[in-house]
Regions:
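Domain-scale signature associated with acetyltransferase and cell-envelope carbohydrate enzymes
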Residues: 1-123, 143-149, 156-158, 166, ...
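Flexible, solvent-exposed loop segments that connect beta-strands
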Residues: 130-137
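ABC-type ATPase nucleotide-binding domain
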Residues: 153, 171
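Short beta-to-alpha loop/turn elements within the nucleotide-binding domains of ABC transporters
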Residues: 162, 174, 180
Length: 206
């Protein structure tokens, strides 16, 4: 309970009013430091076996949603990091969003995004690659941005410094390791490449 007193969890209603809570059904919280804030907007998503881990001075926000969010893992152990997920987010099963162990990293996911199975979003590689010539770290972490209304299919991975433009569809088993910056497009492959433009999508089965 001590760590919960040094950090804050809020439910936020439709009018923006905050209520401090110590429990949200379907979400396990683990605070490794102090001064972190988690905000979950109402109406709450249907959380199922989700976990949020925060270090020092971290911020996590999840928007309101009528959809199921199953096995979301938000790992922001690195200090001064943030993860923001917009409203109407859905997750079929298992997504890890990782900013740890580096500091000052951010992941942003826009509104009305649909994620499939086994998604991995990494703002950091987790281990150093070092130049033998001068000792420089060659693979420092970078922010990740996913726009609004993106459909991300199963077994997808997005790596540090990558972006996905709004309205995009990313195919199964794709790896995004750069800028997918053409809106309303289909991307697929490893690395993900532009396959089709001028599209939109919805959640209904054809």
């Amino acid at each position: 309970m001590f760590n919960f007193l040094r950090n804050k969890i809020y439910k936020i209603d439709k009018n923006g009013n905050k209520k401090r809570v110590f429990f949200i059904r379907g979400v396990h919280f683990s605070f490794k430091g102090k001064n972190s804030v988690v905000e979950i907007h109402e109406p709450l998503a249907k959380f199922d076996r989700c976990r949020i881990v925060c270090g020092n001075n971290c911020f996590v926000s999840i928007g309101s949603s009528p959809y199921r969010v199953k096995r979301l893992r938000v790992l922001t152990n690195g200090d001064n990091s943030s993860v923001k997920i917009g409203k109407d987010f859905s997750l079929t099963n298992t997504c890890e969003i990782i900013t740890t162990p580096e500091k000052n990293l951010n992941v942003s996911i826009g509104d009305n995004c649909q994620f499939g199975l086994y998604i991995c979003i990494r703002a950091t590689d987790g281990h150093k690659i070092i130049s033998l010539e001068d000792g420089t770290v060659l693979n420092k972490g970078k922010d990740v941005v996913i726009g609004n209304h993106c459909w991300v299919a199963s077994n997808f991975k997005i790596l540090k410094g990558s972006t996905i433009a709004s309205g995009s569809v990313v195919g199964m088993s794709s790896v995004v390791a750069g800028k997918c910056d053409t809106p309303n497009s289909v991307y697929a492959g490893n690395p993900a490449k532009l396959k089709k433009t001028n599209i939109t999508w919805d959640r209904e089965c054809p």
